């Protein structure tokens, strides 16, 4: 596997700043793209090549709002997801397109998003496990080869969900940072298997994660999880909650943004020791701007 194009300088910068600052990450791509005109049935990854100017515009809005870390529009851009969504271009093309779209916004740092693959497996020597690991390896290499500063395996609901993905990402990483982010409930347990956040952090770090965090959970869940993660983790902690479930309308899902609540919360997360803060589904650059002001970025 050729790693000569990996962005080693960017990886060093990401690692250094995660260990010394509280960075502000951008908000979501998927829910913002859904709000575009007549976009309800368009898979987010489709935009990377078909409407790159739209993806770049959203990234630029986040940068203008104060985001220091951008996250590629590749949450569902594995070969499995592209096939499911009937997107013809290759994993390499779609993921490189997403990286190029984000780089147009001139971010300080750029993470490559990897979402759940959705294949069930039952043993590490099974065909399914090897398939997931290979799919993750392929996407990780595509993102790293396109120039991201690190990988972000996000919205992880169980250790079973994480295990082959983290293995595949590390197969491709060759020393590049791999961040892992879980989804937890208000009790601090993973949504998929009920494991507590401390045990999830221990597993991720033991198997090579360079950072641990939570995303796409409620503000209350994030507020409870952050100090527990900081107390148990040996790597930088990240936090990016959502605003809750959308209201379904005839024009598609509608979220009710609450930038003031996120602005208040991010101060507490920084005080607790979080290395990167941000927001997830249902927010926009409006929330990012409120957080940037609160953090004096």
Task: Give residue spans per PLM region.
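Domain-level signal for soluble alpha/beta catalytic cores
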Residues: 1-297
């Amino acid at each position: 596997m050729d790693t000569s194009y990996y962005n080693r300088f960017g990886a060093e910068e990401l690692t250094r700043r995660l260990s010394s600052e509280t960075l502000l990450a951008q908000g979501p791509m998927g829910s913002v793209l859904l709000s575009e005109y007549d976009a309800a049935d368009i898979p987010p990854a489709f935009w990377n090549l078909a409407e790159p100017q739209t993806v770049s515009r959203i990234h630029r809005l986040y940068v203008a709002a104060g985001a220091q870390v951008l996250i590629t529009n590749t949450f569902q851009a594995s070969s499995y997801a592209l096939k499911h969504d009937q997107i013809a271009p290759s994993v390499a093309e779609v993921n490189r397109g997403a990286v190029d779209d984000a780089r147009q916004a001139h971010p300080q740092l750029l993470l490559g998003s990897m979402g759940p693959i959705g294949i069930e497996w039952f043993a590490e020597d099974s065909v399914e496990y090897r398939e997931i690991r290979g799919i993750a390896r392929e996407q990780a290499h595509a993102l790293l080869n396109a120039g991201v500063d690190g990988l972000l395996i996000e919205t992880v609901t169980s250790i079973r969900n994480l295990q082959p993905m983290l293995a595949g990402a590390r197969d491709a990483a060759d020393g590049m940072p791999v961040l892992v982010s879980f989804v937890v409930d208000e009790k601090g347990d993973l949504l998929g298997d009920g494991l507590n956040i401390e045990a999830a952090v221990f597993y991720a770090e033991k198997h090579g994660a360079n950072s641990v965090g939570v995303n796409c959970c409620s503000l209350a869940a994030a507020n409870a999880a952050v100090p527990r993660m900081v107390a148990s983790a040996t790597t930088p902690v990240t936090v990016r909650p959502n605003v809750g479930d959308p209201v379904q309308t005839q024009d598609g899902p509608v979220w009710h943004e609450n930038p003031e609540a996120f602005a208040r919360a991010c101060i507490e997360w920084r005080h607790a020791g979080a290395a990167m803060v941000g927001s997830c589904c249902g927010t926009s650059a409006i929330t990012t701007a409120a957080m940037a002001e609160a953090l004096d970025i």
